[in-house]
């Protein structure tokens, strides 16, 4: 048989021409082992730190450990269907979550997926959960108040928009209650709230959502829930997801408030992930970068200036500053604030509110210890009227606690000490407040004015709260215009002081 070279070359040519360029380049690897939500993968030579990985069954993971011949990843969500030998693909993307006002009123998981049974959320945008915090030039000093509606906080440890104020205390001291009251008080203030529940019982989160709904707060609140039944990876990621949702409002010249409840559980979840990835443990078995875990999160809460907002929105929003205020919560063990995570977060934040078990059990609620609670930047942001009226209260309380300790041993006390003790007892009583009952600025001003001018001095201690409640009702019915004026101007003029004094004296006669 004679072979014709030209025929062969024609055949080869036609084959080459018919070859389609449908080949795609993909970076993929193979699962070596999977356990406890941690997966070791062989291959993935081009993977990036923090990159999203795609597993079979529409499951995603996060590449955290990049080693010479393998990659350590955490799986976000269920991992029971993943087995040895499965193919894992790189996505080329960092983990992203949906953002925007469409999330308000909804409960979502750490990946921004709805878990409240109210159907899908049609958000238009997504954003990476990890972002670099605004730089020094982009920031503006904190000088606008973030009213919590809690007398003890707004008078003694005021919080400003863009501040990070730590709420710290043992279990069952009312930490969450303080944060939820602060969210409820933002109604009508133009502040969007994000509540991040980390490692809590699903029933507790349900109760919080119900309370927010009852007080009409859910319409401006996003709840990000990583319950105790979810994987450590989801608990660790949830705080960053919530922060990314809050930054949407900050960067567009609006104000947002985010509560992390709580960062102790987030640190424990991160410790679990790190130990399973065989990272070397340090103090209290936490990994070496646990400080960075919290600092990079809390630094993203800031007040940004108008130039930053204008540049971010490409000129769509002009002349408006944005803010993200953070209220991280830390749970201490038997009041030990010198443990690793509490000291870290204290040093990162702009002040802290200490809640004490002994005060809580003795009926002082919110159980705020005025002596060691501070707000490092909030003083500049405090409302003028509250600032003017609350000056003496903090010192009165601190001296009262000190004297009360001595008075237990002294049999005969001089008149001035007795007077100070009596006043301190009444101030302590006045600062008690029921849960879910935040006060407006004007009513708070009325209470502080009354205690400063000595209208409570001749009352029995147990009558103080009843007198205050009655006084508030009287002011609302008979002096609504004065309350509205204080609410609008945030000031108490000399003429108004006289009217207010007369009104309180008037009410006291009938009490």
UniProtKB/Swiss-Prot annotation:
EC number: 7.1.2.2
Cross-referenced SUPFAM superfamilies: C-terminal domain of alpha and beta subunits of F1 ATP synthase, N-terminal domain of alpha and beta subunits of F1 ATP synthase, P-loop containing nucleoside triphosphate hydrolases
Main location: membrane
Location within or outside the cell: Cell inner membrane
Species name: Janthinobacterium sp. (strain Marseille)
MF annotations from Gene Ontology: ADP binding; ATP binding; proton-transporting ATP synthase activity, rotational mechanism
Substrates-to-products reaction catalysed: ATP + H2O + 4 H(+)(in) = ADP + phosphate + 5 H(+)(out)
A Pfam family recorded for this sequence: ATP-synt_ab_C
Keywords: ATP synthesis, ATP-binding, Cell inner membrane, Cell membrane, CF(1), Hydrogen ion transport, Ion transport, Membrane, Nucleotide-binding, Translocase, Transport
Keyword presence, Cytoplasm: no
NCBIfam families linked to this entry: atpA, PRK13343.1
Topology of this chain in the membrane: Peripheral membrane protein
Top-level taxonomic group: Bacteria
Site (Required for activity): residue numbering on this chain: 373
Classification via HAMAP family: ATP_synth_alpha_bact
Listed name of the protein: ATP synthase subunit alpha
Listed Gene3D superfamilies: 2.40.30.20, ATP synthase alpha/beta chain, C-terminal domain, P-loop containing nucleotide triphosphate hydrolases
